[in-house]
C-alpha cells in the first residue's frame, strides 16, 4: 500500500469494534515494514469497544520480534488521549483518575504501557471511516474477527 512507504520503520493501523457495548468485540491491525504487510486480528465474547481498541494496539506491539521504531495510527480518541495525555498522570496517581476513581481497563493500559516502553513508538490519529486505506483495513479485520466468532 502506498500509505506504508516509510523505510526502516514499522507503520501500523489498528482498530477495535464491538457489536453491543458491552458485547462481542473484535480488534484488527495491519503492520507494514519495508513494503511487507502483516494482518492480525482477534475477538472476545464479552467486551467493550475501548478494550478492543487497546487490544489492537497491544497485539500490534506483541507482534514485533525485536525493538522497533513504529508509528501506530488509531481512530480512537480514547486510545490517543490515554496514551498521550492521561497515562503519565494515572501512573503518578496510583492508577487513579483525576476524580480519584480506578482507571477503567487498567489491566490493558498497564500492558500497553509496558510494551510501549520496549519500542520507539509514535502515535498518530486518523479520522475513522474517512477513506484512509490503513484504517479501513484495520476496521475490516476487526469486523472479520467478530464475524468469525459469531459464526462458530
From Swiss-Prot:
GO terms for molecular function: magnesium ion binding; nucleic acid binding; RNA-DNA hybrid ribonuclease activity. It catalyses: Endonucleolytic cleavage to 5'-phosphomonoester. Keywords: Cytoplasm, Endonuclease, Hydrolase, Magnesium, Metal-binding, Nuclease. Mg(2+) 1 binds at residues 15, 53, 75. InterPro entries: RNase_H, RNaseH-like_sf, RNaseH_domain, RNaseH_sf, RNaseHI. Binds 1 Mg(2+) ion per subunit. May bind a second metal ion at a regulatory site, or after substrate binding. It is found in: Cytoplasm. Residues 6-147 form the RNase H type-1 domain. The keyword Magnesium applies. Its EC number is 3.1.26.4. GO terms for cellular component: cytoplasm. Its cofactor is Mg(2+). The keyword Hydrolase applies. One of its GO terms (biological process) is DNA replication, removal of RNA primer. Mg(2+) 2 binds at residues 15, 139. Endonuclease that specifically degrades the RNA of RNA-DNA hybrids. Monomer. PANTHER family: RIBONUCLEASE H1 (PTHR10642:SF26). NCBIfam families: PRK00203.1. Belongs to the RNase H family. This is Ribonuclease H.
Amino acid at each position: 500500500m502506498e500509505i506504508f512507504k516509510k523505510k526502516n520503520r514499522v507503520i501500523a493501523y489498528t482498530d477495535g469494534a464491538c457489536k453491543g457495548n458491552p458485547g462481542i468485540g473484535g480488534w484488527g491491525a495491519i503492520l507494514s515494514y519495508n513494503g511487507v504487510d502483516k494482518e492480525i486480528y482477534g475477538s472476545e465474547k464479552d467486551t467493550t469497544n475501548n478494550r478492543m481498541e487497546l487490544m489492537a494496539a497491544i497485539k500490534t506491539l506483541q507482534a514485533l520480534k525485536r525493538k522497533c521504531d513504529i508509528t501506530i495510527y488509531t481512530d480512537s480518541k480514547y486510545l490517543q488521549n490515554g496514551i498521550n495525555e492521561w497515562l503519565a498522570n494515572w501512573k503518578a496517581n496510583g492508577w487513579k483518575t483525576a476524580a480519584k476513581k480506578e482507571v477503567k481497563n487498567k489491566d490493558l493500559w498497564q500492558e500497553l504501557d509496558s510494551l510501549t516502553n520496549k519500542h520507539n513508538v509514535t502515535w498518530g490519529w486518523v479520522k475513522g471511516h474517512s477513506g484512509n486505506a490503513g484504517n479501513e483495513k484495520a476496521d475490516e479485520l476487526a469486523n472479520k474477527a467478530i464475524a468469525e466468532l459469531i459464526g462458530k
